[in-house]
Amino acid sequence: MSDYTNTVTVEITSDDSLVADVIVVPVASGAVPRLPEDSKFRAYEDILQKLGVTGSKDELTRIPLDGSKHVVLAFIGVGKAFSATELMFAAGSAVRQIGARCIQIDFSVTQKDKLSAIVEGAFLGAYRFDKYRSKKSECPEVIRVSHNINGITDSECRQIIARAKVIAGSVGLAKDLVNTTGDDLYPAQFASFVAKDLEGIDHISVESWDEKRLQEKSCGGILGVGRGSNFPPRLVKISYTPGQYKKHLSLVGKGITFDTGGLSLKPASAMLGMKYDMTGAANVFAVLRIVALLRLSVRVTGWLCLAENMLSGSAIRPGDILRTYSGKTVEVTNTDAEGRLVLADGLALAGDERPDVIIDIATLTGAAKVALGESCSGLMGNNPDLLCSLEVAAKSVGEKFLAVPIDDDALQKALKSDIADIVNVPTSNKVPGMQFGAVFLKEFETTNDSGEAIPWAHLDVAGPANASYDTGFNSCGPTGVAVRSLVEFCRCLSSAPERKLF
């Protein structure tokens, strides 16, 4: 695995000359297709209308450029408005769909935030995963992004490109991890990759706990889930500690490198995509990488809870009792609810450091996908202000988080076990699965030195973690969901640490 952004060159230019193979122009939807007011290609609006172009997202229409035998105009739909997020998705969609060697994105932008969004979208759209293909996918080699911004300096343009490259490259590495098959990526190999990739980055350190260390620390959740596999579990701690900071954020990621369901075996159709069950850990790694490379002034600690959930003579059985790191015992009523068991250890370990806020991310429940679909992540926690701040951060980068309440007495009662502290799955089928998963994890929240619960949020990304169709800058497969949202949240903590976010 390597940073794919090193294989594509993105340039920012104010040069009006059309020197690319394909010129990409945005078109918005409405009663008639609309181009930006100052676009040099507005004369094509009538042609687009006659062709039935709607301007809907991902719609791509190719027309030969007047007076040129070799240059093609590609009109990409942006939806209803030329907003920064819509332009980002449109740029990414065009780059994803067009295989020409040189592309010029001419969106007639006059604002720096829109230019930044377009460059980021272009980088994200250039991602390809060809590890297991005999023939490589076509991908642009040069992407020129033109603009109409007065007074922007070359230095500012370089900064925009550098930032977008860091974000897209890190998201790409997370996607590579998720795309890699279970037989090529077991817990120890995952841990080794993270340590090697982050080596040499300023202010960042990586610590990997093997099964012996996990045993010494009494991490019964991670050990229990991993004991049925020939490949033992790992816990990876990534620490980013800049020279100056005022806030400390802990991120905990579920990292089940393959999930058979254990003895509560999944059906074959449900097992096929279970290499994706380590999305949370992969995306936490990406957030730490971005935050460190962008040198944000916020301390961030990542906890990657890595295990393979297999079935064997040594696998945990329904009815077994696991003692987690916190000392709390769990009756395993279903071995296919293993993600919450590894997160239980990760959350308690994160709490030991008394950070200002803890956020976990996991493909935790199928119920989240049923309830919210593929475009929205479930957001739950113990602090309404934190949930609101995360929703705002997500919206600003074009993602969707929906806060879901979990303060329900019935959910609390469903945790009850006859022989242990709690169960991992309720015996009643009337309990909402997504919310119960969060209520289970809430049992492992920690108090700060003042005796108050540390603000905690749980992101269930089971729906948007994996796209079932191509859209925007994402091809079918892993999406890197929540990475950019959490980076934006970190940026807020870094730039305005006194601002009330939780």
Swiss-Prot record:
<dbReference type="GO" id="GO:0005737">
    <property type="term" value="C:cytoplasm"/>
</dbReference>
<dbReference type="InterPro" id="IPR043472">
    <property type="entry name" value="Macro_dom-like"/>
</dbReference>
<dbReference type="InterPro" id="IPR000819">
    <property type="entry name" value="Peptidase_M17_C"/>
</dbReference>
<keyword id="KW-0645">Protease</keyword>
<feature type="binding site">
    <location>
        <position position="259"/>
    </location>
    <ligand>
        <name>Mn(2+) 1</name>
    </ligand>
</feature>
<feature type="binding site">
    <location>
        <position position="338"/>
    </location>
    <ligand>
        <name>Mn(2+) 2</name>
    </ligand>
</feature>
<feature type="active site">
    <location>
        <position position="266"/>
    </location>
</feature>
<dbReference type="GO" id="GO:0006508">
    <property type="term" value="P:proteolysis"/>
</dbReference>
<dbReference type="GO" id="GO:0070006">
    <property type="term" value="F:metalloaminopeptidase activity"/>
</dbReference>
<dbReference type="Pfam" id="PF00883">
    <property type="entry name" value="Peptidase_M17"/>
</dbReference>
<feature type="binding site">
    <location>
        <position position="277"/>
    </location>
    <ligand>
        <name>Mn(2+) 2</name>
    </ligand>
</feature>
<feature type="binding site">
    <location>
        <position position="259"/>
    </location>
    <ligand>
        <name>Mn(2+) 2</name>
    </ligand>
</feature>
<feature type="active site">
    <location>
        <position position="340"/>
    </location>
</feature>
<keyword id="KW-0031">Aminopeptidase</keyword>
<comment type="function">
    <text>Presumably involved in the processing and regular turnover of intracellular proteins. Catalyzes the removal of unsubstituted N-terminal amino acids from various peptides.</text>
</comment>
<dbReference type="InterPro" id="IPR008283">
    <property type="entry name" value="Peptidase_M17_N"/>
</dbReference>
<dbReference type="InterPro" id="IPR023042">
    <property type="entry name" value="Peptidase_M17_leu_NH2_pept"/>
</dbReference>
<protein>
    <recommendedName>
        <fullName>Probable cytosol aminopeptidase</fullName>
        <ecNumber>3.4.11.1</ecNumber>
        <ecNumber>3.4.11.10</ecNumber>
    </recommendedName>
</protein>
<feature type="binding site">
    <location>
        <position position="336"/>
    </location>
    <ligand>
        <name>Mn(2+) 1</name>
    </ligand>
</feature>
<keyword id="KW-0464">Manganese</keyword>
<keyword id="KW-0963">Cytoplasm</keyword>
<dbReference type="Pfam" id="PF02789">
    <property type="entry name" value="Peptidase_M17_N"/>
</dbReference>
<dbReference type="GO" id="GO:0030145">
    <property type="term" value="F:manganese ion binding"/>
</dbReference>
<keyword id="KW-0378">Hydrolase</keyword>
<dbReference type="InterPro" id="IPR011356">
    <property type="entry name" value="Leucine_aapep/pepB"/>
</dbReference>
<keyword id="KW-0479">Metal-binding</keyword>
<comment type="similarity">
    <text>Belongs to the peptidase M17 family.</text>
</comment>
<feature type="binding site">
    <location>
        <position position="254"/>
    </location>
    <ligand>
        <name>Mn(2+) 2</name>
    </ligand>
</feature>
<feature type="binding site">
    <location>
        <position position="338"/>
    </location>
    <ligand>
        <name>Mn(2+) 1</name>
    </ligand>
</feature>
